[in-house]
Amino acid sequence: MNMRAVTLIAALCTTATWAPARAQTVETSVVKFPQDIVYKGLPGAPQHVTLYGDSSQPGLYVDRIRFLPGMKVMPHWHPDTVRTVLVMSGTFYFAVGEQWDESKLVAYPAGTLYSEPPRTPHYAWAKDGEVILQITAIGPTGNVAVAPKKP
């Protein structure tokens, strides 16, 4: 077999493997305009909206979380295998640990991207005003509260 034939066969095989990925991307396209994003949540709790996927199921999902000014999130963790967080607006104060310790909080301004390793306890505060986060992760997810240590 000459080199030209080998190259042609390799190109056809490669192109054939791309077709399902392209088709799948088109079938799962999602568009969310700002006016279509409606946050929901209980009073006193962070508000939530799912932009893509289903965080209760295995697979990729994208959520936005809105924290009202002054809202504190006590130590907890998530089971996601991969979890990245983008601070979209506001300044988010974040720390890793099982106990609330204000001195360990680090200010993450808008535009900051960070990751949360699986099952790593952390806590946060929307100290200076409203904060909006965008979470991109592999589900299923959940919030597991960390019980405070007794003195």
Whereabouts are the PLM-identified features?
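Positively charged n-region of N-terminal signal peptides that target proteins for export
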Residues: M1-A5
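Conserved short histidine dyad/triad with adjacent acidic residue
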Residues: Y61-P79, P117-P118
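Glycine- and acidic-residue-biased ligand/ion/polar-headgroup-sensing regions
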Residues: L68-M71, H78-Q99
